[in-house]
Amino acid sequence: MSILSFLLGEKKKSASVAKERLQLIIAHERVGGRPPADYLPALQKELVAVISKYVQISNDDIRVSLERQDDLEVLEVKIEIPQA
């Protein structure tokens, strides 16, 4: 972080904000919150809304899944972006 960005209060990038949100959701799940199926549809809608700001996509162009194997959780996001 440079002194100038510190003094002017540089905005966080949307990717870093999204990453923090996903980390919070997964951490909440590990503690024993609600089942993962509850938030995945909402997460998918939010991802479509954010990506649609930059590229035209539909709900069918994105897939979100959470797989659990023993102590490992994998959140997988697949996005089909149309060719320009």
Swiss-Prot record:
Pfam families noted in UniProt: MinE (PF03776)
An example Gene Ontology biological process: regulation of division septum assembly
SUPFAM superfamilies linked: Cell division protein MinE topological specificity domain
Keywords carried by this UniProt record: Cell cycle, Cell division
Gene3D superfamilies attached to this UniProt entry: Cell division topological specificity factor MinE
InterPro entries for this protein: MinE (IPR005527), MinE_sf (IPR036707)
Record family assignment: Belongs to the MinE family.
Biological function: Prevents the cell division inhibition by proteins MinC and MinD at internal division sites while permitting inhibition at polar sites. This ensures cell division at the proper site by restricting the formation of a division septum at the midpoint of the long axis of the cell.
HAMAP family the record matches: MinE (MF_00262)
Record protein name field: Cell division topological specificity factor
